[in-house]
């Protein structure tokens, strides 16, 4: 029997419905908001795999073209590999749910979200998160939920709950907040240099407005929820852990507090071999899973105890210390802009590339939102960056997620298309990794863009703040320590990875990941202000190397020539099936874009190529404009000058004084009838006739060739 719960959520109503669709799943809920609807199912197996030592949670979100009344793109006209949007939404669903499964619950679990209907106004990602929580709540799968998700915006100082795509375009912040009844669990988003004080207010506002969604899920679970299943939870073998502590605590302490990551890993690997052999002598029936679990548990205990009691970290730093920073720019000769950003043992090589607007990425956004992107950032994490051998395939979900975080952190300072009509791409190659590579990408990306001459509004830097909590109890926050600029090991054994990027004025990008069942807002606020302090230090380091964009773009980057044609002539320039414009591009070697208002942009790194393309376009559809330069033919010579003809555009006069920089006594000594010359339109006389200058055209063309 279908059951549903309705709640007012922002300006609209959110509806949770279960018992109608996908009834064979352990839990199934359809969430509707406006005319956007997402079906989310949860299934968990009842058979535990032997030696399974982690929670194999798989979260997949998919958007169907039919939901928006469209055909899929591509040759086969069907949905294929997940898009970046689908992957990012899957990650947003996964991250707040993972800490809420019982400790030791290692049963294979799958959560699937499917977009059923898209109204093009409301982003389905928030509904998918709420649906996943609700599906687990009505199922028999053990789960310490529910959680509620909301998107928050701010327009003209006014908070907006679940802003539409159009509202998000003008909002000062785009915050996705996921929280429990008591604490935040996950946040993600971007902002336009948002002040830290206002950011904390946004979190408080969001926390208030997830409570209705949480209450709705509780009510639905009370109506139709199944009793939670009994299951076997993996428990650490305390006898082995205690014995390891007796025998190896001192050696583990020394190994963990080795400043070099490589040396630390070697010591820990050697120690594990030794202690495994020793434990098997004393505990012959111990499984590899039990030994590894106890070994990791002891490392974690030693690490956390040291941080809490001595405030000393593995590399000798204090809680708020930043690792040494080294920066270089212009490190790749043929790149349009590049930088090498090193923070401790984390190293990011970032390269910026400029191209025509034709290279902007077209998106199949079935759920609405932007349909194209002219600024792209791609993040690559090769296995050698951590000293490993691995498969080289397409980008992983993690790489896509890290790239998206860095991209939205830099986007608020990217110049508008009007001010800088280029498509822009930053690629980040992580060459060494020991924590916080996404924030290194933000710093390196900002430096590379400035090196490329992109007129950024200001520099952007990022830092990650970690956390070690004293007690496991959810509500006991009497003892904790926040760590600035965390290492990979601190991320692994710590409780939080809070990435925040921004400028000197405020925050531009953020992402919170927790291993706990939430964190108090006041602790989050301390982390936010701690990151602000660190960001200023990093920006100072960056500004010492490059504090403003280069005055000129790279000689290898395409230059731009801008022409205005009458909109009625756009079709003539494009030609049937794009034949004409493609021919001009092929013959000139330039890339050409055409806007609906008749603006034609010509891109080429060669001045000759630019001139050739401009000449061909002008010959075909151009109109004479003051300041324009044209190839013309001399049709008659007079004592006072010469008359020229511009193909398809009529005639005009070049006065004798405009023929050359040097005095001219006889016109026929400079030009002859039938000769082709370059002229610049310098005005219109009182009768509406164009006046041209040969010397002005030659001077301007010479200056362009010298660039």
From Swiss-Prot:
One of its GO terms (biological process) is RNA processing. This is Polyribonucleotide nucleotidyltransferase. Mg(2+) binds at residues 491, 497. It comes from Methylacidiphilum infernorum (isolate V4) (Methylokorus infernorum (strain V4)). The lineage of its organism: Bacteria, Pseudomonadati, Verrucomicrobiota, Methylacidiphilae, Methylacidiphilales. Pfam families: KH_1 (PF00013), PNPase (PF03726), RNase_PH (PF01138), RNase_PH_C (PF03725), S1 (PF00575). Its EC number is 2.7.7.8. Belongs to the polyribonucleotide nucleotidyltransferase family. It catalyses: RNA(n+1) + phosphate = RNA(n) + a ribonucleoside 5'-diphosphate. The gene is pnp.
């Amino acid at each position: 029997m279908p059951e549903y719960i309705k709640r007012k959520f922002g300006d609209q109503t959110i509806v949770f419905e279960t018992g109608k669709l996908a009834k064979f799943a352990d839990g199934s809920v359809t969430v509707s908001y406006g005319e956007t609807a997402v079906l989310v199912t949860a299934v968990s197996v009842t058979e535990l795999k032997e030696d399974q030592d982690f929670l194999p949670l798989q979260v997949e979100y998919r958007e169907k073209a039919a939901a928006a009344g469209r055909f899929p793109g591509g040759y086969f006209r069907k949905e294929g590999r997940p898009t970046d949007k689908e992957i990012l939404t899957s990650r947003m669903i996964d991250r707040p749910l993972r800490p809420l499964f019982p400790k030791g619950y290692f049963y294979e679990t799958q959560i699937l979200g499917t977009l059923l209907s898209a109204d093009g106004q409301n982003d389905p990602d928030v509904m998918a998160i709420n649906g996943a929580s609700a599906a687990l709540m009505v199922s028999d799968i053990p789960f310490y939920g529910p959680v509620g998700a909301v998107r928050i915006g701010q327009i003209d100082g006014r908070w907006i709950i679940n802003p539409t795509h159009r509202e998000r375009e003008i909002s000062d912040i785009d915050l996705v907040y996921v929280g429990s009844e008591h604490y935040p669990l996950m946040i993600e988003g971007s902002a336009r240099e948002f002040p830290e004080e206002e950011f904390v207010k946004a979190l408080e506002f969001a926390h208030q407005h997830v409570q209705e969604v949480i209450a709705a899920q509780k009510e639905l679970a009370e109506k139709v929820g199944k009793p939670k299943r009994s299951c076997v939870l993996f428990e650490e073998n305390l006898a082995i852990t205690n014995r390891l502590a007796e025998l190896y605590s001192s050696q583990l302490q020394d190994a963990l507090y080795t400043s070099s990551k490589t040396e630390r890993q070697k010591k820990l690997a050697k120690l594990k071999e030794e202690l495994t052999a020793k434990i098997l002598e004393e505990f012959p029936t111990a499984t590899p899973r039990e030994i590894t679990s106890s070994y990791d548990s002891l490392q974690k205990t030693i690490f956390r105890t040291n941080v809490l009691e001595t405030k000393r970290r593995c590399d000798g730093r204090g809680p708020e210390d930043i690792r040494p920073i080294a920066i270089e720019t212009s490190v790749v000769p043929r790149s349009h802009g590049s930088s090498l950003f090193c923070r401790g043992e984390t190293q990011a090589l970032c390269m910026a590339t400029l191209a025509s607007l034709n290279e902007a990425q077209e998106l199949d956004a079935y759920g609405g939102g932007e349909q194209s992107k002219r600024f792209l950032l791609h993040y690559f994490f090769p296995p050698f960056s951590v000293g490993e051998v691995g498969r080289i395939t397409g980008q992983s979900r993690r790489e896509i997620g890290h790239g998206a975080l860095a991209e939205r952190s830099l986007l608020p300072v990217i110049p508008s298309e009007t001010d800088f009509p280029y498509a822009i791409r930053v690629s980040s190659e992580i060459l060494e990794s020991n924590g916080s590579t996404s924030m290194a990408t933000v710093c390196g990306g900002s430096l590379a863009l400035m090196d490329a001459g992109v007129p950024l509004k200001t520099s952007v830097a990022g830092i990650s703040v970690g956390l070690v909590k004293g007690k496991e109890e959810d509500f006991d926050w009497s003892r904790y320590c926040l760590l600035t600029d965390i290492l990979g090991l601190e991320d692994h054994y710590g409780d939080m990875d809070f990435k925040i990027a921004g400028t000197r004025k405020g925050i531009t990008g953020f992402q919170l990941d927790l291993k706990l069942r939430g964190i108090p807002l006041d602790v989050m606020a301390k982390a936010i202000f701690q990151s602000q302090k660190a960001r200023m230090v990093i920006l100072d380091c960056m500004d010492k190397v490059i504090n403003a964009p280069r005055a000129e773009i790279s000689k290898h980057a395409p230059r731009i020539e801008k022409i205005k044609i009458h909109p009625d002539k756009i079709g003539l320039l494009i030609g049937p099936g794009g034949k004409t414009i493609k021919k001009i591009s092929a013959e000139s070697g330039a890339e050409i874009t055409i806007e609906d208002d008749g603006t034609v942009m010509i891109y080429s790194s060669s001045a000759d190529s630019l001139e050739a393309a401009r000449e061909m376009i002008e010959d075909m559809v151009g109109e004479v404009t003051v300041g324009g330069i044209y190839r013309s033919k001399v049709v008659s010579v007079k004592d006072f000058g010469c008359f020229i003809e511009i193909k398809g555009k009529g005639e005009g006069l070049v006065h004798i004084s405009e023929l050359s920089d040097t005095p001219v006594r006889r016109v026929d000594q400079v030009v002859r009838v039938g000769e082709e010359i370059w002229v610049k339109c310098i005005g219109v006389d009182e009768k509406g006739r164009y006046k041209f200058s040969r010397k002005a055209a030659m001077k301007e063309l010479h200056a362009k060739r010298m660039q």
